[in-house]
Amino acid sequence: MSAVLDLVRDLIARPSVTPQDKDCQQMLAQRLARIGFQCETIARGGVTNLWARRGTQGPLVVFAGHTDVVPPGPREKWDSDPFVPTERDGYLYGRGASDMKSSIAAFVVAVEEFVAAHPQHEGSLAFLLTSDEEGPAIDGTVIVCDALQARGEKLDYCIVGEPTSTHELGDVCKNGRRGSLGGTLTVKGIQGHVAYPHLARNPVHQFAPALAELVGIEWDKGNEYFPPTTFQISNLNSGTGATNVVPAEAIVEFNCRFSTASTPESLKARVHEVLDRHGLEYDLEWDLGGEPFLTARGSLTDALSSAIQAETGLTPELSTTGGTSDGRFIAKICPQVIEFGPTNATIHKINERVALDCLDPLKNIYRRTLENLLLAH
């Protein structure tokens, strides 16, 4: 059995549904300590975080990941127990197989091999692991980044083990992510009888023209790395349930996924301008889930791309699509952040799985990336 497969099986067998860690990090810390890592647990709010570092000199290469997984859903719909790693038809099945316990296992083994071959390597290595990536993400990576910044630890490169590959290992890596700006809008009206609309003020009718304008706006044109910003209504609720009552208010929840071509302030200003111009009486609460980040082509993208090409023969696409990740926190303290891992077709789904024949190549890509970054210095 490969060392990566052995480790990922151990991790899957620990039912670490967010924010639980189920001693995944403790097991990994003990393993890393044997090859010279200094390990530190940072816990808050029921969340466990691990910062493990080997070396004190720069450059510092960090692997970031999460030991928590999403709930399995109805277990009876799985073909095998989601927390009993099962090999079948060339795949390893289990919750977290792709997202992202295989990446963690591959990087740990890659580091073990790298240190064994190059015990006096220049620079430093580190792991940043959390059990709060799939949850609210308020006691996880963000507080570790705050602690590192407060004590002046300088990160140079970070690889986040998110499952970025689309069709086969190595076809896509993420060199950035869009930002997320949510809003909860309450449009105020006057409740009344539908037969006497002149004695009421219907907030749905009032908001409809503004809604049509908002969904038709071209917020920006995107840029070389990002698609244009999008605006989507996710929920729209109004009324009492009765068919003869004009509602007193309409509550609208929306989200903007935005690129570096826009800022949260510019998006907020445009929304308020539309609402004000339509004469609406409203309250609007904003929630900035994360700002966009981007790592332009450079030493980290080149190191990873070269490693992928050497191992798979593929030239990876650099992409910024998809949802948010913990990379948004790390990018504030690390100038170069990239995400790379196995295929993502089954993440969060029933029968989540990872191809068995990608585990060792994934480990090799991570190891080659370390060699490209640290042995050239």
From Swiss-Prot:
Record key words, sorted: Amino-acid biosynthesis, Cobalt, Diaminopimelate biosynthesis, Hydrolase, Lysine biosynthesis, Metal-binding, Zinc
Transmembrane residues, as ranges? Answer: none
Catalysed reaction per UniProt? N-succinyl-(2S,6S)-2,6-diaminopimelate + H2O = (2S,6S)-2,6-diaminopimelate + succinate
Known cofactor(s): Zn(2+); Co(2+)
What are the recorded GO MF terms, alphabetically? acetylornithine deacetylase activity; cobalt ion binding; succinyl-diaminopimelate desuccinylase activity; zinc ion binding
Please state the pathway this protein functions in, per its UniProt record.
Amino-acid biosynthesis; L-lysine biosynthesis via DAP pathway; LL-2,6-diaminopimelate from (S)-tetrahydrodipicolinate (succinylase route): step 3/3
Concerning Pfam families, the annotation shows: M20_dimer, Peptidase_M20
Summarize where Zn(2+) 1 binds, as residue positions: H66, D99, E162
List the active site. D68, E133
Alphabetized PANTHER family for the sequence:
ACETYLORNITHINE DEACETYLASE, N-ACETYL-L-CITRULLINE DEACETYLASE
Q: What does this protein do?
A: Catalyzes the hydrolysis of N-succinyl-L,L-diaminopimelic acid (SDAP), forming succinate and LL-2,6-diaminopimelate (DAP), an intermediate involved in the bacterial biosynthesis of lysine and meso-diaminopimelic acid, an essential component of bacterial cell walls.
By sequence similarity, the record places it as follows: Belongs to the peptidase M20A family. DapE subfamily.
Q: What is this protein called?
A: Succinyl-diaminopimelate desuccinylase
Gene field: dapE
